[in-house]
A protein has these predicted regions:
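Hydrophobic alpha-helical core bundles mediating ligand binding, dimerization, or RNAP-core interactions
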Residues: 81-86, 100, 186-189, 216
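Short beta-strand micro-motifs in enzyme catalytic cores
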Residues: 110-112, 122, 163, 230-235
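Short amphipathic alpha-helix that is part of the acyltransferase structural core
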Residues: 63-98, 106-135
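Conserved acetyl-CoA-binding loop-helix of GNAT-fold acetyltransferases
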Residues: 169-172, 177-193
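Conserved acyl-CoA
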Residues: 155-160, 184-201
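Conserved acyl-donor/pantetheine-binding loop and adjacent beta-alpha core of acyl/acetyltransferases
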Residues: 125-169
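Terminal substrate-recognition subdomain of acyl/acetyltransferases
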Residues: 12, 59, 63-65, 170-171, ...
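Hydrophobic, helix-forming membrane-interacting segments
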Residues: 1-61
Length: 255
């Protein structure tokens, strides 16, 4: 299709070049009838060029990948997410892709991602964890690299119990920052928990980069601890976090 589009481009270009020269030589004969014919040639050529250009744009638009919210994630997508994380920190701070995919298979709301074509370019991990995991995160003794499915809390179970939320990762490729993508993904993530939002009391982040810490500050988090693996632990009320997400307009410091 790309070659066909290129051939179309060449044909349009040739027509755009040849038609004026043809009209020029017709006019050069000096006859009024030929001048009228030249005008018709130019007008027809212009219409053809415009139509061909519109058709070419349509063809290219149909074939070009578009930025979209990924409907169904595969394990390959989680491998792409891990590769994005690896650009910023080491493997000892990255959840193995197969494990993160297990989270998603059991609780699809754990991961919201944006893709360009089939390539993940941004994602958010937000979910409740069990009380002991949350407390270990808060006191800095737990590295979520080791977090498994067993450590996640089922938001539909124990309807009277509070939920302890963990914003595990927020990452957007640099080329896609400044588009409001991070805020949009966060908004979609918190929408999933609206039915149980009254049970969501606190939310925590574990930041291994300065950019991550700055992101947490901008979204209302306050530092509570430095972890045993030298990351910065931030926390706030969940309702306050939701308000920051909904109220954010200029916050495009993506981590």
């Amino acid at each position: 299709m790309f070659w066909q589009a290129n051939k179309s481009s060449i044909m349009v270009l040739l027509l755009g070049v040849v038609a004026p020269f043809t009209a020029y030589f017709i006019i050069g004969s000096g006859k009024n009838g030929n001048i009228e014919l030249a005008k018709q040639v130019l007008a027809t050529s212009l219409c053809v060029v415009l139509f061909a250009a519109a058709l070419l744009s349509f063809i290219l638009a149909k074939k070009s990948p578009t930025l979209r919210i990924a409907d169904e994630l595969t394990e390959q997508h989680f491998e792409q997410m891990a590769a994005l994380e690896a650009q910023y920190y080491g493997e000892d701070n990255i959840t193995p892709p197969a494990e993160a995919y297990r989270w998603y298979q059991r609780y699809p709301a754990t991961t919201i991602a944006a893709a360009m074509g089939e390539q993940i370019v941004a994602f958010v991990n937000l979910f409740p964890v069990k009380a002991d995991i949350y407390e270990a995160l808060r006191n800095g003794s737990f590295n979520d690299h080791t977090l498994t499915l067993d450590g996640l809390a089922d938001p539909q179970a124990a309807p009277e119990e509070p939920l302890h939320m963990f914003l595990c990762c927020v990452l957007t490729e640099p080329a896609y920052r400044g588009l409001g993508l991070t805020r949009h993904l966060l908004s979609l993530a918190i929408e999933h928990y609206e039915p149980v939002q009254h049970r969501c009391q606190r939310i925590i982040t574990d930041n291994v980069t300065p950019e991550g810490a700055e992101f947490s500050r901008r979204y209302g988090f306050e530092q509570v601890q430095t972890s045993s693996h030298d990351s910065l632990i931030f926390e706030q009320d969940y309702a306050s976090f939701v308000n920051h997400v909904h109220g954010t307009r200029q916050m495009e410091v993506d981590s």
